[in-house]
Amino acid sequence: MATSKTIVLYLCQAPATASLYVSADTDADEPIIYFENITECLTDDQCDKFTYFAELKQEQALFMKKVYKHLVLKNEGAFNKHHVLFDAMIMYKTYVHLVDESAFGSNVINYCEQFITAIFEIFTLSSKIVVAVPVNWENDNLSVLLKHLHNLNLIGIEIVN
């Protein structure tokens, strides 16, 4: 599907020539996804399974709200923050640090990748996605996810000097 809209996500300093998306109106009431709550539930022995389950459901609900809102209002432009696609990448980085290399940990990362892939697939229905990265981007654990998304032709990767 050819599209004329482009979303550029800056994971590095945006060039002075880039016109970054700014909208205090839509960002003021923007829900914030706190991945720390899930981290605390997993690491706190006092946290019960229902609290953990509630935190997961809250994360999912906030993601769905933001995906819809950003698909409508932020399906074009250059961003360095305040976009659900950044939230997805932050979730990935958080979970990679949280889990170990056990079968459980591998499953968590796999499900996380599937969830994030679906979000990027949804956005590619209306927009081309380019992720601008620094020269040393492959030193970051996020590079695994970015390469995965690139191999699926969901994103373009642009190295910014």
Swiss-Prot record:
Q: Pfam families under this entry?
A: AcMNPV_P18 (PF05081)
Q: Which InterPro entries match?
A: AcMNPV_P18
Designated name of the protein: P18 protein
Taxon lineage: Viruses, Viruses incertae sedis, Naldaviricetes, Lefavirales, Baculoviridae
